[in-house]
From Swiss-Prot:
Subcellular localization: Cell inner membrane
Protein name: ATP synthase subunit a
Topology versus the membrane: Multi-pass membrane protein
GO cellular component, one term: proton-transporting ATP synthase complex
Assembly: F-type ATPases have 2 components, CF(1) - the catalytic core - and CF(0) - the membrane proton channel. CF(1) has five subunits: alpha(3), beta(3), gamma(1), delta(1), epsilon(1). CF(0) has three main subunits: a(1), b(2) and c(9-12). The alpha and beta chains form an alternating ring which encloses part of the gamma chain. CF(1) is attached to CF(0) by a central stalk formed by the gamma and epsilon chains, while a peripheral stalk is formed by the delta and b chains.
Lineage: Bacteria, Pseudomonadati, Aquificota, Aquificia, Aquificales
């Protein structure tokens, strides 16, 4: 069962994210605090995609917003005792990365047709085969870097936090200051949780933009 814990926690993260959105309800003249937070988040995501892709970026707004919520709540689960965060498992981060990877290539061909292949050929025709190989390696590298970045940061952060807590509560000399240190560490961890969700979102947006936005020459 422990081998599938990341699947269970992933489902929980998705359910929580969906529940938060549904709890916000329909837009109102006087929005609740939760609705204000959700609307602010959606506006932030909207600004992100339109700045990188223009109005056509709105097509990808649901995807980017959903990715952000999933990664955020997946990361938050790391703060729960005896729970392995789904984003601290390489299978989860790799699956999420592959969704983005295949989607932006699909969209690249949908928008540009076979002309999308020119993105891999470089500016010099004589060196096209060389550039093609380099670009393929670069795109595959995105899968590795995007999935490992999130996994390593969340897994490493969890191990470090547990280790420090163990040292604090296991030593009578540090036990007295442990509450202050713990508050500081948790604050830093929360900032890291938000930052990692943002990084995954912005990189996903940039990768999609690179595939669908026509460059001006």
């Amino acid at each position: 069962m422990e081998h599938y814990e990341h699947v269970i926690t992933s489902i929980v993260a998705m359910v929580v994210a969906l529940g938060v959105v549904l709890a916000a309800g329909k837009p109102k003249i006087m929005p609740s605090k939760l609705q204000f937070v959700i609307e602010s988040y959606i506006n932030f995501c909207k600004s992100m995609v339109t700045e990188n892709m223009g109005e056509q970026g709105l097509r990808y707004l649901p995807l980017i917003a959903s990715i952000g919520l999933f990664v955020f709540f997946g990361n938050v689960m790391e703060l729960l005792p005896f729970v392995d965060a789904p984003t601290g498992n390489i299978n989860t981060t790799l699956a999420l990365t592959l969704i983005v990877f295949f989607l932006y290539h699909f969209e690249g061909f949908r928008v540009n047709g076979l002309g999308y292949i020119k993105h891999f050929m470089g500016p010099i025709k004589a060196l096209a085969p060389f550039f093609f190989i380099i670009e393929i390696m670069s795109h595959l590298g995105r899968v590795v870097s995007l999935s490992l970045r999130l996994f390593a940061n969340m897994k490493g952060g969890a191990i470090l936090l547990i280790s420090i807590i163990g040292v604090l509560i296991g030593n009578p000399f540090t036990l007295a200051v442990s509450p202050i240190v713990l508050v500081f560490l948790i604050t830093i961890k929360v900032l890291a949780i938000v930052l990692q969700a943002f990084i995954f979102m912005i990189l996903s947006t940039i990768y999609i933009a690179g595939a669908v936005v026509h460059e001006e020459h």
